[in-house]
Regions:
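Intrinsically disordered, low-complexity segments enriched in small/polar residues
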Residues: 19-138
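Sec-dependent N-terminal signal peptides
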Residues: 5-14
Length: 138
């Protein structure tokens, strides 16, 4: 009985740590509640967040700058990892977008643009062993 309880608590801890590392917020606003973000994730981003999905065979590095000039804490998205969500809710309201930069692990720029909230940025395989970016707005 104790073994089942320990195994269950380990699974819950692992699941919560995966959830926490896939949600990125403004460095000045560490609130856990983001208005506009769905309670249960569907297959698209909420209106106040940007979703980044890596479906390529390459690891990518994501960085950016929020509207107020504060940099996003850079993070890596590994090949076929679960989606990452960048919250645009800070200073008490939802911001329109941010400058987003996505580079390959070797430093080659894949995407550099101002990205609006509610956008899904999908990194997909391209040609032999490269990657390209596809955008969808919901």
């Amino acid at each position: 009985m104790k073994l089942k309880a320990i195994a269950m608590s380990c699974l819950v801890a692992l699941g919560s740590s995966v959830y926490a590392t896939n949600n990125h917020v403004h460095p000045e606003d560490k609130s856990a509640v983001v208005p506009g973000a769905p309670a249960v994730k569907a297959n698209f981003a909420g209106y106040c967040e940007i979703e980044v999905i890596n479906q390529s065979r390459r690891d990518v590095w994501v960085s950016g700058t929020f509207d107020d000039g504060v940099p996003l804490d850079p993070f890596a998205i590994y090949s076929y990892e679960s989606p990452h969500y960048i919250s645009l809710y800070y200073y008490g309201y939802c911001h329109y977008g941010m400058d987003l930069y996505i580079d390959s692990a070797s430093g080659y720029p894949l995407y550099t643009a101002y990205t609006k909230g509610g956008t899904t940025v999908r990194i997909v395989p391209y040609l032999k062993d490269n990657a390209k970016v596809e955008l969808s707005k919901h």
